[in-house]
Amino acid sequence: MQALVIGIGNPDRGDDAVGVEVARQVAAERPDVTVLEFDDPSEAIDAWEPDDTVVVADAVSSGGHPGDIHVVDAAAQKLPTGRWSAGGTHALGLAAAVEIARALGRLPRNLVVVGVEAKHFGHGTPMADAVAAAVPAAVEAVLTALDDADALLNELDEADADAVDADTVVAAIDDLGGEP
């Protein structure tokens, strides 16, 4: 099991660079986390494993205000139609890639998507000011998702340890011929 952050986007296509930029800043903050960059969301399916914790950062286009941040637990629910359904600058949209992974049984148990509302995807253009200004908040959302997943996994590990201890006690009582 590993923690994995994936930045989706193309740094040469305006606001589409935001996912990659968020991932790069997370790498600087959390050297213990594996950070990958892809221009096509479908590439992520081969990068993760079912027991991984994965946070994906990507540009979204839902008609909201540039720089708005959307956080979705994609392991628990489908990505909202309209935000990640179209391919944008990608051959395949993130929503389609996630649903393909779900259908193939390749969805990680913890998958959070952090999207930054984008508007301009032109070749050779910089990120819009509002999108660039949202990067620190998106980085914080990714870090929070990682911390929340770590806390949940620690709780599950403790519950597993408690279950083992209870099983050991029951076995010891059985060996003594008593009732648990």
Question: What do the predicted segments below correspond to?
Answer:
Residues 119:
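Short "lid" loop at the C-terminus of a central beta-strand within the Rossmann-like core
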